[in-house]
Amino acid sequence: MLTEKTKKELIRLSKVNNYIIKVETNQNFKHQSKCGDQILFQIIETNNGKFNLKHHASGCIVLLASANALNKLCNNKAKSEILNLVQKVINSNFANLDEIDVSLKIFNVFTNTNRKDCFLLPYKSLKDSLESYKPLRRTIR
């Protein structure tokens, strides 16, 4: 059972961010789970080789909170750094999630439950999105 503190933190992390996503169609990457949760990533590479990430997600509170935490954690970082972090989480190469980042500590509850898929969908989606990313003809400063 989740504590009230955990519930409040999940609700805070899951606040809906509205983004208007307007880029070339090959820069939008949508993933959907069996239960109907969906996430769409927009990836833009800046001139310094770092990536600006935006996402639009619809689904359960665990997915929304996980997506927001991941976006804050990976925004404005290099591709290799993002892929390394995401791969660690997907492969469970940690004793506790707070080893990776303190902001992920709240998700330790879900790593061995049936909600693990909800937690991992943004990570798998971002990994697939970055691996299939094709740079635009121009980059943004």
UniProtKB/Swiss-Prot annotation:
CDD domains: IscU_like. One of its GO terms (molecular function) is iron-sulfur cluster binding. It comes from the Bacteria. Disulfide bonds: none annotated. This is Uncharacterized protein BB_0085. GO terms for biological process: iron-sulfur cluster assembly.
